[in-house]
Regions:
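Membrane-embedded transmembrane-helix bundle of lipid-linked glycan/lipid transferases
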Residues: 1-395, 521-545
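Generic signature of intrinsically disordered, low-complexity segments enriched in small/polar residues
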Residues: 2, 52, 81, 89, ...
Length: 545
């Protein structure tokens, strides 16, 4: 690599770092995080995962102290492994708030890098790749996810969507079918945000149906290989998930579309985008932002002049925008598998991707790619981002929104387990249990002085006195995989009203409860780990050749 090329790459890296920093400016200058929408749930996930990593448990399945020590299966249904960088920041001594912003910066940088790689891999043009990276990483809907909704999983999904689409692109439009990339990216989407992974799969099916003529034997083979590899790489999550849902019915099985999504209109989207603000979550205004809205309008007015590719991208963007609003009859699917999206405006994630791609395509077609013009577009995006962030910070301040700080993060709303309590067994009366977090003996909450509890990281112990044979519901939310002991004797346990339940004979009992995980969890994790290791080894050996 010559000196000039090295300087260009260094400049690109610096710009990507700039984009990443701007995405969280000026939030990272504060010593607090505004508590909005999903923040309290993710605050708890982040802190509990940090605790499990300290005990070298990277796949905890159940966070034993989450939910007032009742133990919550967040990791069973919402994977935590990608939170590892945050845990590392905490372990090396960085406090909660700066660790949170460092983690957000890292996510933004990965998003900027993967989106740059996406377009560079297709076009082999650095300026276009840099512009797309800027538009996509600083897309307003991504900023809403990141800093207004605190939707950590969906923010992570933004980072891997470009790799997923690149994998699909290579299978259908090139001779080099990168089906392994498609598998890895889908596995990362699953590990990030299951809803986004599910809708990525739905959109892939729609794409295949629309492009069936391109689906020859080679494409079908690559898709099947990719699907099989995805199942293998994600077995550590998918099979334990299916195991739990086969035996138990959870609250998320009854998901319906929320009114805030069903009432979201196209006029709402346009006016919100023009305003360049989203407001705190109580007055959330989902949108794609002023810049991308202008891009879509320009593309529509100049549609006949556009290149074939830009016409296709325009149509894809418009379709996704309309799907995100109530122009599409979402009410028909209010109680269906499609209702897992909760809010149809979540599709603005995909709209933002294609609108950013459209913006880059228009700039290329209209030949606005001089170095000065490229820097001008980056400056415009940066300015709008700062404006958006500052406006939202100001509104949160003016409404005296609750804040999470380094002092209160661990004891602030300790019982928080998410808005919908999705990962509790259906009809679990968590409010009753939280009000009296003690064993329930034959349906009566125990208050006997002999009944004592001791909660450690990997087990909880209870000293109980029973009169005759009695049924005892322990203060632990039930998931398959618990082990209950009376002294050294392992007891059979089962679910009753959402709690781990056992039957005890007459006398005083020393009960210990620990989540030992299931055979399926252990074997599937081992399989996925070995498969991932083989893929990495194959990649490294290929690099050496």
């Amino acid at each position: 690599m010559n000196s000039k090329q090295s300087q260009k790459n260094t400049l690109i890296l610096l710009i990507l770092l700039w984009i990443s920093a701007i995405s969280i400016f000026p939030y990272f200058l504060t010593n607090y995080i505004f508590s909005q929408d999903d923040l309290l749930f993710h605050r708890t996930r982040l802190d509990r995962y940090y605790q499990t990593v300290k005990h070298l448990d990277f796949f905890p399945r159940v966070f034993p102290t989450m939910g007032l020590n009742f133990g919550y299966g967040a990791d069973l249904f919402y994977p935590s492994i990608l939170l590892l960088p945050f845990a590392f920041f905490r372990i090396i001594g960085i406090s909660f708030v700066p660790s949170y912003y460092l983690y957000q910066f890292l996510i933004s940088f990965i998003t900027a890098a993967t989106s740059y790689y996406f377009l560079y891999a297709i076009k082999n043009k650095k300026k276009q790749a840099l512009l797309f990276s800027c538009f996509y990483t600083l897309a307003t809907y991504r900023l809403i996810d990141q800093s207004v909704r605190a939707a950590l999983g969906e923010t992570l999904a933004f980072a891997f969507l470009p790799l997923f689409i690149l994998g699909v692109y290579t299978i259908f439009y090139t001779n080099q079918h990168r089906w392994k990339l498609l598998s890895v990216s889908m596995s990362l989407l699953i590990a990030s945000h299951l809803i986004t992974a599910f809708y990525s799969f739905i959109l892939l099916i729609i794409f295949i149906l629309l492009n069936w003529k391109k689906c020859k034997q080679a494409q079908i083979k690559s898709l099947i290989q990719s699907g099989a590899l995805t199942i293998g790489l994600s077995a550590w999550f998918l099979f334990p998930y299916l195991e739990q849902t086969y035996h138990l019915t959870f609250n998320f099985a009854n998901t319906t579309l929320w009114a805030t999504g069903l009432n979201f209109s196209l006029s709402n989207l346009i006016s919100n985008s023009l305003a360049n603000v989203s407001a705190p979550f109580t007055e959330l205004k989902p949108n794609i932002g002023l810049f991308l809205l202008v891009v879509v309008i320009i593309a529509c007015f100049n549609y006949q002049k556009l290149t074939t590719n830009n016409k296709k991208i325009t149509l894809a963007t418009l379709c996704l925008i309309l799907l995100a609003t109530n122009i599409f009859p979402w009410a028909f699917f209010k109680v269906s598998v499609l209702a897992t999206i909760q809010f149809p405006w979540r599709l603005l994630l995909f709209s933002s991707f294609f609108a950013s791609l459209l913006a880059t395509g228009l700039i290329e077609q209209f030949q606005l790619l001089s170095s000065r013009q490229v820097l001008m577009f980056i400056a415009i995006s940066s300015f709008l981002t700062i404006s958006f962030n500052v406006n939202n910070l100001m509104q949160s301040n003016s409404q005296n929104s609750i804040t999470v700080t380094n002092k209160n993060y661990s004891d602030f709303y300790e019982s928080e387990i998410g808005h919908g309590k999705e990962y509790l067994i259906k009809d679990t009366d968590f409010k009753k249990y939280f009000a009296s977090p003690s064993p329930i003996i034959d349906g009566v909450s125990s208050s006997d002085s002999l009944n004592q509890a001791d909660n450690k990281y990997n087990y909880s112990s209870y000293t109980l006195q029973t009169n005759g044979t009695q049924e005892v519901q322990l203060p632990k939310f039930y998931y398959k995989g618990y082990e209950v002991k009376d002294g050294q004797k392992v007891l059979s346990n089962y679910n009753k009203a959402g709690l781990v339940t056992v039957k005890l004979d007459n006398g005083i009992h020393n009960i210990t409860v620990s989540y030992k995980k299931t055979v399926i969890q252990t074997v599937s994790l081992l399989f996925s780990t070995l498969l991932a290791g083989l893929l990495i080894l194959q990649f490294l050996m290929k690099k050496k050749k």
